[in-house]
Amino acid sequence: MMKKIAVYLFLFVSMVSLGNVKDPFKDEKFDSAYKNIKEIFPGDFRCRFIIKQVLLRSFHEDNKNTEMIDNFDSSLTTYGRIIQEEGLFLNEKDPVEVTTQYYAKYCTVPEEKWLDSFESPALSKYFNSIKEKYPRK
């Protein structure tokens, strides 16, 4: 009986917490950026995958959805390991940082005016860290 109560309580709490998560695709700016990734963030398939994850993660970071942030960190971790399996950035210990290094080296960083108009502190922070850590020559 206690197990059933615990399971129902867990399911109820999960539904309530997921019900509070804001849908990024109902946000006009986010939806437009996501649909136009190829134009805004040109690059290869890896660049597009990474930026999709970063956009989603940034949206949830801006909206304080910690569970969703963890999900996208997990996705970036897996992708960083895949990139390393292919022989890139082997000296890096953090797989999420591998995706950041890949993005910095091979992908497009949007113009500052686009970032300002997008109004995402988390996304701006991501690109500012790329500019600081991995300046383009």
Task: List PLM regions with ranges.
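Short N-proximal segments of mature Sec-exported proteins
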Residues: 29, 34-84
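Classical Sec-dependent N-terminal signal peptides that target proteins to the secretory pathway
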Residues: 1-20
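Compact alpha-helical subdomains of small soluble proteins
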Residues: 71-137
